[in-house]
């Protein structure tokens, strides 16, 4: 009798273990599917800046190199405002463009973001989900027709402020970094090599340190542990110098860490920089 009970117990444990593995696998697959949809939407918008016209007037006497630097700075700032990854991307004014000392006009999309951000229901502060909420804002306000692709199970609401965000198979936020230079070390599609994979938005190569950056969309996976560097704001001009000197698209040295893993659990993250997940 004891042997029978022992065998039944072992079989029950094996069955429960198999069920748990199946549930975890299902959650991973659901997460990959959601990230794949988000990847297509975000990259479509991101790539559109390669041919995007910017409303700037180049004054007479400007050299071709200076013109290219002005346009590159304008495109980068436009991307920051229309594809925000953090709340100060929404609240900050357009930056002054090099050589001409004037900013871009605020794009209509930024004004929509600001109306929501500064409305009667602003996001909480501090906000650990800000990168996830920015991603939802970009998709829902910048590409509203794309929302039809998502089931309600892929969306959650922060009860503290009412803001929405996409969630993974574990019900945790899916995060977003527009530029993640620090993830090059574990990315299948972002080499971090300016010589062999330069910035495609810099057609005149006026920023020799700029390399091809691809938006990072990620989940913390099974661990759920916060393990990616996101704390550093981007600056196109160094505020620590006078006069402020230009920086690369990666910004100041500390910004270049954004997207880098900060714990070993990051190896289990699910993200769009792994080819099999795209």
Which residue ranges define each predicted feature?
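N-terminal pilin/flagellin-like segments and related low-complexity appendage regions
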Residues: 32-278
